[in-house]
Amino acid sequence: MKESGRKRRVKNKPNLNYGVIVENRRFCYMVLGGTRDIVQGELRRKLRHQMKELAHPKKDEIHLTYSGPLKRLLSIRTAQSVFVRRDFKISRPRTLLSPENMSDLVNWIRSVSQLTGNCWNSFRIDAAGSQSPTMLRIADAIENALELPYDPDEGDGVLAMRPGELGWELLCRIGTRPLATRSWRKIDYRGSLNAAIAANLVFMTQPDPGDRVINIMCGGGTLLIERLLIEKVVFAVGLDVSSSAVTATSANTLGASVQNLINIVRCDAKRSGFANSIFNVVMIDLPYNTVGSQRLGNRELYLQVIREAARLCEIGGRAVMITDDHSALNFALSNLKDDWKVMDERIITQRQYRPTCLLLRRI
């Protein structure tokens, strides 16, 4: 084997062949815990009769067959990533080393790579025992056949392998990055939301082109940008007290080409100065800290910010908010029972991060 990924191509830029039509292939969308129903809803709206859902035991994945434009397949905003799936009727990975199976495997990987203009610079294998002698032999065979360096740590082409019901399931990711990685993000502001989580929050509000939206504590603008890329608005405001947040939001809205649709304001989220009931949708990415003394301070902060949100939101309007400080959130809402009614509460799981996401209705 070549020196385990040390060989490098000149970096290729993704060249997604959006015009290509895929025919009756199996795909797998990776989703975060707590978002499956929202992702399914987006898939059904966008892919419609061109998709057929497939039963699968993994709850953090959605499997389906699809025939149609690649562009539509990659337009899903709420999923983390999308893979092409291929089932091999083998009892163990070693069988892939046979000339017939390896030729089949390499041709399949090549066909997936071609969907993105052969933009991979290297590849890695995601599997139990990925550094075992058998897996390394498989990686070596793929590397030689595709002339693509194997990089077990940072390969941008991803091949997942695992046992399935009828043999082994192989999943090959489309593109060099997860779907949740957005090209519009020019400044990665500290604490910025995962963009797919933000898109899930947006769909929780049932976005409508007649909405008047404010994103309180907008940070780098992720929630606000995802809202504008999903549906039109009457007007939208991003609000943050931090000058660096305002700068980040400005840069990112420019990257998303929505800068003319947003008014970015630097002011105190507890006293915004806007008129009463001017908005019908409020989105809040609440800050949180892991240090105990700082978390105690969140209680009063959350109470004041969510009270201000109630002042800004018209009766019957909606609010979504996300935080990992469950105690401070519960404290604030217990003191604002006359202002808000909880319509949806869920915990979204992203590795060790388990924030509470709430949809509220103004009463």
Model regions: which residues?
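Non-catalytic nucleic-acid substrate-recognition regions in nucleic-acid-modifying enzymes
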Residues: 2-152
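Class I S-adenosyl-L-methionine-dependent methyltransferase catalytic core
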Residues: 2-47, 55-61, 66-72, 152-156, ...
